[in-house]
Amino acid sequence: MLCNKRVRANVSQYYLLNMQDIPSLEEFRTQAATFIAAAVRSNDACPAYGAILPPHLHEPAMHWQRFCFEEGWAGVHWPQEYGGMGLTPAHNVVWHEECAIAEVAPYLNLQGLVLAGEAILRSGTPQQRERFLRPTLRNEILWCQLFSEPGAGSDLAGLQTSAVADGDQFLLNGQKVWSSNAQFAQFGILMARTNSDQPKHKGISFFLLDMTLEGIEVRPIKQMTGDSEFCEVFFTDVSMPSDSLLGEVNEGWGVAMAVLEDERGGAGAAGVISLGKRLETMAEKSTALDDVRTEKLTGILNRGKALQALMERRGGDPLIAPVAKLMNSELGYSEAQLNSLLQGAEAMLHSDTTENLLYSPGMRIAGGSSEIQRNIIGERILGLPREPQPSE
């Protein structure tokens, strides 16, 4: 990617943090905004995108992640020994907010930086942390998530993919589905059953799977958007080395639940900032913004502000994760529907609008369906009776 070398050099000279003194959030906000602005001017920053990474932004996103690492701005709250900045989760929230304000992507690979990386930081051995964390930040390893199965999506504990211990390795067999970008990933975070005699939530282990191992077949799934973001993955007698195990054998459920909390609870002010900017753009472009449509637009923004306030008050509370996931999914769906409504027939002439509209129903399914999130909220937060299962 072409860039202004003088501006790029100034990024390192003036804007890197002195990590001997952890800056206050406001100091860090100023530093982050300055760094991002310089990166935008030098064409090193990748423009923000929604749930889908468009093909034309793949290389810019790859470059932006590497650039942030080289300039010392990757992994805001990761330990310095693994290439991070050694700051706090609150500083990481500020980074996301400033990226949203500048309409810049905060990172490339959610599965790697948010899901796999955080899991390895929490549960990994020193060897696993050394092997995976820095290369992931440096964008040398892309990750995918291998959780859902044809018969175990919402009921994840019903998974059947097996990993049988065999000497110094595990023999992996089974199938996963709806794995984002598995066709590009070098590694995947995998849940597999290691003890079929134990109850559903037990007997499951968590693995860091090398996607280049023999016996792995990845088949991209054609979506109605025309893209193939999701894949189904088949495992036939795949020999995984024993050091692929993350955490203890048969104790993977707890590791996985923490990962899902990371995935579902990542919303906050940054998402609301991005939402507000997109709604503002909608209003500017619309030629039919009557009272009814204005009410719909402000209603979406107000719901976003409510989510932001909730996250600010209860941030870090794992019980908030399903609430955040549900609200984000519904906001994304409502936004896509409204954008199409405001543009009318012209919406079909704009590829981004059409793609978002076609993708929007999936927002209520991916990462845990809205129905499942409502069940979790009802049972775990509100204390309502458990929903009967079909077998009961």
Q: Where are the language model's segments positioned?
A:
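Internal helix-loop-helix
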Residues: 62-65, 69-140, 181-187, 304, ...
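A short, Trp-centered hydrophobic/proline-enriched beta-strand micro-motif
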Residues: 139-147, 191
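A structural signal for short hydrophobic beta-strand segments in well-ordered beta-sheet cores
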Residues: 161-164
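Glycine-rich phosphate/cofactor-binding loops in nucleotide/flavin-utilizing enzymes
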Residues: 21, 90, 94-95, 99, ...
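A short core secondary-structure module
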Residues: 169, 173-219
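Glycine-rich beta->alpha junctions and the first turn(s) of the following alpha-helix
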Residues: 21-23, 216-307, 363
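Glycine-rich phosphate/pyrophosphate-binding beta-alpha loops
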Residues: 152, 177-183, 224-225, 362-369
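Amphipathic, small/basic residue-rich leader segments at the start of a protein or domain
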Residues: 4, 9-110, 131-135, 290-298, ...
